Amino acid sequence: MNITGVIVEYNPFHNGHLYHLNKTKEITDCDGIVAVMSGHFVQRGSPALLDKWTRAKLALLNGVDLVLELPTIYSTSSAEFFAYGATSLLDGINIVNNLCFGSELGNIDIILKTSKILQEEPLSFKEDLKNFIDKGISFPNAREKALINFMRKGKNSFDFNNVLCLSNNILALEYCKNLFKINSNIKPFTVKRQGSHYNCLHLRDNLSSATAIREYIGNNENLDNLVKSVPETVLNMLKNFQNEQCKFPFEEDMFTYIKHKYFSNTGSIENLPDVSEGIHNRIYRALDTCNTLKEAMDMIKTKRYTYTRIKRILCHYFIGMDMINSDELRRKPCPYARILGFNRKGQDILKLIKKSSNIPIINKIPKKIDSTLNLDINATKCYSLLNKKVNPLDDFLKKPVLK
């Protein structure tokens, strides 16, 4: 079988995702699609709108054949570790031929060329990167400036301005960089992103961004206006959730629990992997004085620490990453493939995986639980505080979704 992998969050699944899946099938001519999907918390440090089993079900209803969970240690990390965890998982199951991802660039040759530079870090690039960081510039901006300088020295005709400031391009580069890093045989493909850019806050008829859809859901009770933005299956699921008088979980909902943990002297923000240069002191001052997450992030923000990085740190604190050696864990390849759901074709793919995989396949929680899986279990417990439809022990109680 010719199997293609996709790396996703589906928060929530929308028409842009459907377009990506259809184009993926077209350009890779694949027999099946395996999705590696974030669990209950996503890459920007937020809780997912719907639980991971519901999102897996929606993925299966809209073209995916097998959904595997990206462990929380990677799913809530920066693009580098997010991509490393996902690509190492796809490589580890040893049956994936292709990886297809969206990008604003839409040019796989330029993405591969650029990712090779980021992986090898030539001396002049490395020196420029260090100089920009020493000036107090955030890592993402410093890397973009260093790349532009390096490309100019090489007299490249392509304009690299803004390549590294667009969300899907950043992830695309990290996917390819990590495929090089792990010496994978998986062949990368890209689909040019259509419609609104990732951070657009306004609904567009057919291809609204996930950000715009979440923004709308957070501010409106009438979900009918999403009819042109998401497939019918997704809209029905969102309405069902709302009709059961459940509140959609958002990052702001974490703040009360974060403050409670801090005031209880439980854990330590200094132990988190992305905390350095005394930023924890700014965080502690914000927790002492602020009443909302937004107010706290505004107070903590510095030139080097972006809003996303701060939110990610607070999310890590909320789900208990300060209690483990999370930096060591996220630098290791994904240790298992946990099944969230599959259809009949996915069942055939699973048979191939079980014969070929280099990593364990998990469909129910084993007796022996390692630190990575234990964090996933703890993330579900924390998520259940925000989404009342989720039981704290659902990781033990729920079976993979079968469609």
UniProtKB/Swiss-Prot annotation:
InterPro entries (alphabetical): Rossmann-like_a/b/a_fold, tRNA(Met)_cyd_acetate_ligase
EC identifiers of the protein: 6.3.4.-
GO BP annotations listed: tRNA modification
Keyword Ligase appears in the UniProt entry: yes
Cellular localization per UniProt: Cytoplasm
CC per GO annotation: cytoplasm
Disulfide bond positions: none
Single GO MF descriptor: tRNA binding
UniProt keyword list: ATP-binding, Cytoplasm, Ligase, Nucleotide-binding, RNA-binding, tRNA processing, tRNA-binding
Residues engaged in binding ATP: 7-20, 102, 168, 193
Catalytic activity field: cytidine(34) in elongator tRNA(Met) + acetate + ATP = N(4)-acetylcytidine(34) in elongator tRNA(Met) + AMP + diphosphate
Biological role: Catalyzes the formation of N(4)-acetylcytidine (ac(4)C) at the wobble position of elongator tRNA(Met), using acetate and ATP as substrates. First activates an acetate ion to form acetyladenylate (Ac-AMP) and then transfers the acetyl group to tRNA to form ac(4)C34.
Entry protein name: tRNA(Met) cytidine acetate ligase
Originating species: Clostridium tetani (strain Massachusetts / E88)
Lineage per the UniProt record: Bacteria, Bacillati, Bacillota, Clostridia, Eubacteriales
